[in-house]
Amino acid sequence: MKEIIASNYSIWIGENSLSKLNVGSYSKIAILVDENTKRDCLSKLPKLENPIIIEIQSGEEYKNLATCDFIWQELTKHNFDRNSLLINLGGGVICDMGGFCASTYKRGIDFIHIPTTLLAMADASIGGKLGVDFNHLKNQIGLFANPKSVIIYTK
């Protein structure tokens, strides 16, 4: 396993990288997935204590404010506070949406990216750029915010 220090967060790469999923003393934890990552990847994560699973539809057409509203509603429904964590398990849409929603919910909660596609591993999960599409234009609303860590599982 290899650790890369990027700005102020670690990027863990390797077959044992999921062991670096540090949820610390967060008050609540949610995992953002789509139907594909829920089916194929969620079971690979280490067991977490009572995580909330937030499932959105897969595809670029769902990377919008309506989906953000759904994510924010779920976080609110489950009483997430500023000491909560959102784990983004998926490709570029999940990383962009999850990071954007976490960074804007209650003026920012922590998030961790666990990218599941090569493009997300090389682009969407690193660099801190987060955005959603608006009026059918890509990444029209966004911001820059870094995750607590990026975990790239290679097994």
Short names for language-model regions:
Residues M1-L85:
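ATP/NTP phosphate-donor binding region
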Residues K2-E3, H78, S103, N139-G142:
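Short secondary-structure boundary/capping segments
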Residues D40-S43, M97-G99, D123:
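Short glycine-/acidic-enriched loop or helix-start segments at secondary-structure transitions
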Residues K44-L48, C68-D69, C101-T104, I126-K129, ...:
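Short, glycine/charged-enriched secondary-structure capping and boundary segments
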Residues C68-Q73, G91, S103-T104, L119-D123:
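Hydrophobic, well-ordered secondary-structure scaffolds
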Residues D81-C101, Y105-T117:
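A short, small-residue-rich loop immediately preceding and capping a beta-strand
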Residues K106-K155:
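A glycine/threonine-rich phosphate-anchoring loop and its flanking beta-alpha core
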